[in-house]
Each structure stands twice: as structure tokens, then as C-alpha cells.
Amino acid sequence: MSRIEGVLKALKEQGRKALIPYITAGDPHPEETVSLMHTLVSAGADIIELGVPFSDPMADGPVIQLACERALKHGTSLRQVMAMVKEFRKTDPDTPVVLMGYLNPMEAMGYEAFADAAADAGVDGVLTVDLPPEEADQVAPLFADRHLDPVFLLAPTTTDERIKAISEHSSGYVYYVSIKGVTGSATIDVDEVAKKVAHVHELTALPVGVGFGIRDAETAAAVGRVSDGVIVGSVLVDTIARHQTDPDALRNALTDLLHPMREALDSLAH
């Protein structure tokens, strides 16, 4: 059982929902990332999605695009991101880390070298936004051999046939994108999400995490009621942007944002 599967299984047994925050590695500065990861855990994170900065993040809205720009300006590379995870692992052997990014940096490193480096660093899962599961044949065995969970995205428009195909190629959890469009856009329709997630659950045994549109404790609780976990990204990255010159204020602001979400999710426990 992978670290991700273990955490999600334990939460399910407790009747609790996963809180999965996203930050971009290297933003606001590479030296800050490991400390921010620990802050997320202290504030209640169960799993961390760590973004690998890329120059053309096409699925992301302006908030995360700017975070990628800030990180790349500081020279944050894929190998540096691996080093950050390795450093994080020295004092946190338990919290799963999922690398989230685009195919290009992985291809540039080489799939096998990437899988080796990820496993060595203590990475638990990989979500590659622009890698369709049917094209993942090259990486799937490399990930499986190293106990890395491949995580894939489901959209509101994903067909049943495709949901089943994605489920077959996935492990750990699947990431349901609640809104059509880029990250940070629009308002979430919880009733619509509830219907879609219930339908996804009919087609896959994997836990379903829901992201896009979760901005506060209220939306976290609403989405948590109908899913296995909530994924919070743009609002955290926006907070980082607003406090990028003051590390202490930044950590406090992230805690103030995330901790009420944790409490709201735990209030749903049964």
C-alpha cells in the first residue's frame, strides 16, 4: 500500500475527508518551499500537491501562471523540486507529496531518470496535466516499479468510457476538476459536483478529490460533503503572492486560511 493509499484509507475509516493543498515549488523563493510545506501540514494538510514550475502552464489561470514565473525567475528546476521533497522528508516521513506539473520537464530529464529521482526523494504520486492516461504506457511501469501513484484529472465533460479508462491507469486518487476552465476561475456549483462525483464513484473504486473553486471553509465543507477530499490551490498561491516579502506573515496567512478548512472538514466526520 502506498503512502497516499494508507492516508486516504485511514481517513475513510475515521469518517474524515482529505485536505490537499497545492503550492508551486520555488514560490515565492526556493528557500521558502520546505518551510511552507511544513506549515501546510501543521495547518491540517493530509497530502501536499507540489507544483513543478513550467513556462507554459496552459491549464492554470493567472494566479498560478504568475507563481510559475516567480519560481522560474529564481531558477527553480525539476531537480531542485526533488531536492526540496528530499529535505522535507528528513523531518516528515508521513505526509504524502504529489508532484503536479507538465510533461516537458519530465521528458527533458528522461522518464526513467525522473522516476528514479522522484522515488529517491520520497515523492508519492505524479499528476501530469498534459499526459493522457492512454499515452502513459512509457511511464506507467516505471512508476509502478517505484511505488509512485499516477494521478489523473477528470473534467465535468469526461465520458463514462474515459472515466473507466482513467481509473484503470490511476492509483492513489483521481482529481475531479469541478469547473470548466483554468484554475482559479468561476464559482463552484456544489449540486452539480455532487451529482458528478456520485457518478464517478459508480465507475471507480478510487477516492475522488475535488479541486478548482475552493476558496474558504464554507466551500471546503460543501465539497467535502460530496467527495473524499478537497484540493485547494489558487487561493493559497494568491496568498503567497500577497505576502511574498514577509515569511512570517505568509506562514500565518496560510495557516489562517487552511486551518478553518480543516476544522470545517472535520465537522463532517461521522
UniProtKB/Swiss-Prot annotation:
InterPro entries associated with the record: Aldolase_TIM, RibuloseP-bd_barrel, Trp_synthase_alpha_AS, Trp_synthase_suA
Family, similarity comment: Belongs to the TrpA family.
Example of a GO cellular component annotation carried by this entry: cytosol
Record: active site: E49, D60
Catalytic activity from the UniProt record: (1S,2R)-1-C-(indol-3-yl)glycerol 3-phosphate + L-serine = D-glyceraldehyde 3-phosphate + L-tryptophan + H2O
EC number(s) from the headed UniProt entry: 4.2.1.20
Origin: domain of life: Bacteria
Signal peptide feature range: none
Protein name: Tryptophan synthase alpha chain
Pfam families in UniProt: Trp_syntA
Function: The alpha subunit is responsible for the aldol cleavage of indoleglycerol phosphate to indole and glyceraldehyde 3-phosphate.
Record GO terms (molecular function): tryptophan synthase activity
Gene that produces this protein: trpA
Assembly, per entry: Tetramer of two alpha and two beta chains.
Lineage: Bacteria, Pseudomonadati, Pseudomonadota, Gammaproteobacteria, Pseudomonadales
Pathways involved: Amino-acid biosynthesis; L-tryptophan biosynthesis; L-tryptophan from chorismate: step 5/5
Keywords: Amino-acid biosynthesis, Aromatic amino acid biosynthesis, Lyase, Tryptophan biosynthesis
